């Protein structure tokens, strides 16, 4: 396991930011750490990067304990914090060369990460002259300098425009082919675009830890059906497993079933038996956003 967290609790006074959290992340794997604001995402990442100590519990990164092997952990981790600390008066290349010296990394690696993160046309500028998106790239380049086995990225796509989003997503996906990438976000589309697996945290506790495909299993199913005339909601509730019915427009109904079995054939048979004509019949896939709301509301 590249990351192993066991029974981590972090308390600030009387408030528990994390409550008995356990999970693991393999290599290579891209895992999205998803949760609403204040759920404990950044706190967990600061513990994994040794910037915070847990109140109780244990965590390991590449086999090194965050509690007493901080230097070994830091050598194996590339960290992009949520609020990316940069020296705005330094030039991009100068800043990266300075940090390369800290890591005892050859200067040639600086040019590699500049090219890898798309910073070549901006490398001659001061960081203060860069847009928010390019500053994020500088932070990511810095995290990659020492070629770490584990990347911990806190809200890595914050402030990026649509074109920059595509570039950074592609970069993170390519890095995830041979590294462990653990990234936090509250944007569902980011998880669906980049991640193999999702861990959802709410109020300091893990509420889901599954592959995206598995997360959708066991959820409700919604069928959209249009008839040629109005049908009473109570009548449609006679369908097996029907949980709720909503008349969304004219003769179009949204029927929610408490099963993952495809219910379209049942709706068709029900309509046929009751001499109802169907004009359209579709299955509405549950979005990660709706599942997120369900798990964190």
Each PLM stretch: what is its role?
Residues 1, 14, 250-251, 275:
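Beta-strand-connecting loop/turn residues
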Residues 167-256:
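ABC transporter nucleotide-binding domain
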Residues 58, 126, 222, 277-280:
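Residues at or immediately flanking beta-strands
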Residues 93, 188, 230-233, 261, ...:
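Alpha-helix N-cap/helix-start and coil->helix boundary motif
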Residues 98, 112, 234, 269, ...:
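Surface-exposed charge patches
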Residues 259-297:
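C-terminal coupling/interaction segments
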Residues 2-5, 10-202, 206-208:
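ABC transporter nucleotide-binding domains
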């Amino acid at each position: 396991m590249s990351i192993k967290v066991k029974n981590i609790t972090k308390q600030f006074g009387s408030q528990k930011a994390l409550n008995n959290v356990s999970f693991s992340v393999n290599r290579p794997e891209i895992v999205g750490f998803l949760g609403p604001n204040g759920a404990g995402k950044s706190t967990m990442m600061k513990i994994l990067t040794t910037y915070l100590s847990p109140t109780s519990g244990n965590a390991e990164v590449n086999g090194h304990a965050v509690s007493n092997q901080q230097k070994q952990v830091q050598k194996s981790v590339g960290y992009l914090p949520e609020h990316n600390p940069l020296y705005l008066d330094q030039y991009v290349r100068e800043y990266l060369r300075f940090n390369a010296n800290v890591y005892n990394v050859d200067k040639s690696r600086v040019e590699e990460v500049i090219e890898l993160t798309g910073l070549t046309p901006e490398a001659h500028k001061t960081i203060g002259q860069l847009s928010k998106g390019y500053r994020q790239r500088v932070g990511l380049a810095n995290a990659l300098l020492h070629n770490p086995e584990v990347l911990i990225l806190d809200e890595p796509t914050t402030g990026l425009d649509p074109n920059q989003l595509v570039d950074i997503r592609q970069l993170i996906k390519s890095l995830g082919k041979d590294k462990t990438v653990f990234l936090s976000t509250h944007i569902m589309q980011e998880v669906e675009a980049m991640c193999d697996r999702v861990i959802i945290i709410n109020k300091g506790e893990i509420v889901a830890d599954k592959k995206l495909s598995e997360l959708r299993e066991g959820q409700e199913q919604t069928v959209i059906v249009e008839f040629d005339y109005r049908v009473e909601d109570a009548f449609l509730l006679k369908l097996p497993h029907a949980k709720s019915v909503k008349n969304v427009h004219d003769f179009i109904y949204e029927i929610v079933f408490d099963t993952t079995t495809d219910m379209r054939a049942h709706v068709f048979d029900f309509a046929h038996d009751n001499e109802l004509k169907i004009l359209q019949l579709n299955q509405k896939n549950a979005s990660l956003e709706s599942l997120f709301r369900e798990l964190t509301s």
